[in-house]
């Protein structure tokens, strides 16, 4: 019985320790298809490798939040880190700038990654 209690306490300690682990997210911004001015496309922001799961992701057009954005369900990898995909329809042109802004507990300030149409 004592052995069972010790094992249960060790399991609880290990599980509570998972919340203390923090991993900064990797942020990738890309379009679904190669960019062509005037041709509808999808802008994607893939955020991966982060822990804990509390995160805020915004897609931006010329520095302003895009309201009509969809996202995948929060999922986790084999290493228990999380990943998400945020996406929206957009039509690229030469004057507008697009980016993904991420707020996470591992950042002192939100991080913004610009979309590079040549990637």
Swiss-Prot record:
Chief localization: secreted
SUPFAM superfamilies hit by this protein: Immunoglobulin
Keywords assigned by UniProt, alphabetized: Disulfide bond, Immunity, Immunoglobulin domain, MHC I, Secreted, Signal
Residues annotated as domain Ig-like C1-type: 25-114
Cystine residue pairs: 45-100
Signal peptide range: 1-20
Pfam (any one): C1-set
GO cellular component, one term: extracellular region
GO biological process: antigen processing and presentation of peptide antigen via MHC class I; immune response
Localization terms from the record: Secreted
UniProt keyword rRNA-binding, yes or no: no
Stored InterPro entries: B2Microglobulin (IPR015707), Ig-like_dom (IPR007110), Ig-like_dom_sf (IPR036179), Ig-like_fold (IPR013783), Ig_C1-set (IPR003597), MHC/Immunoglobulin (IPR050160)
Presence of the UniProt keyword Hydrolase in the record: no
Family (UniProt): Belongs to the beta-2-microglobulin family.
PANTHER family in the record: BETA-2-MICROGLOBULIN, MHC CLASS II-RELATED
Record function comment: Component of the class I major histocompatibility complex (MHC). Involved in the presentation of peptide antigens to the immune system.
Oligomeric and partner information: Heterodimer of an alpha chain and a beta chain. Beta-2-microglobulin is the beta-chain of major histocompatibility complex class I molecules.
Annotated protein name in UniProt: Beta-2-microglobulin
Organism classification: Eukaryota, Metazoa, Chordata, Craniata, Vertebrata
Gene that encodes it: B2M
